A protein has these predicted regions:
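Active-site donor-binding acidic/aromatic loop of nucleotide-activated sugar
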Residues: 1-2, 55
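Flexible loop/turn connectors
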Residues: 20-118
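Structural motif
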Residues: 2-20
Length: 118
């Protein structure tokens, strides 16, 4: 889904999906605010969540659990990911001009928080 006003983008994203596909049984969003827009659009179009369409967010913010229909989400280690990215930038800045930064492959653990939208 596009970036910007997350709520509106989530809402408009459902409209675009309805135009492009006959049936959609699941929607994954990048942020809970997009998910809130998706849930609103689905409700207004008469779709039942999760019976007809499942919704999952990739951010895992607490707000998703506070909704009327609590949103399922993936809990990502954002602080750890941000710290590692900052460390890599600092290593690159501090490296000698003739040193290339090494390519690094990192895997971060996630946790599925199952709620009412799946």
């Amino acid at each position: 889904m596009p970036r910007g006003n997350y709520f509106k983008d989530g809402y408009k994203g459902v409209e675009r999906l309805k135009e492009a596909f006959d049936e959609v049984d699941g929607i994954m969003v990048a942020a809970d605010m997009q998910g809130i827009g998706v849930l609103r659009a689905l409700k207004e179009s008469g779709k039942k969540v999760p019976k007809e369409v499942k919704v999952i967010s990739l951010t895992g913010h607490a707000i998703g659990g506070m909704l009327e229909t609590a949103m399922t989400s993936m809990e990502l280690p954002g602080r750890e990911m941000g710290q590692r990215a900052a460390d890599m930038i600092l290593e690159d800045i501090e490296a000698a001009d003739d040193e290339k930064p090494s390519v690094q492959h990192m895997v971060f653990g996630t946790k599925l928080i199952e709620r009412e939208t799946t």
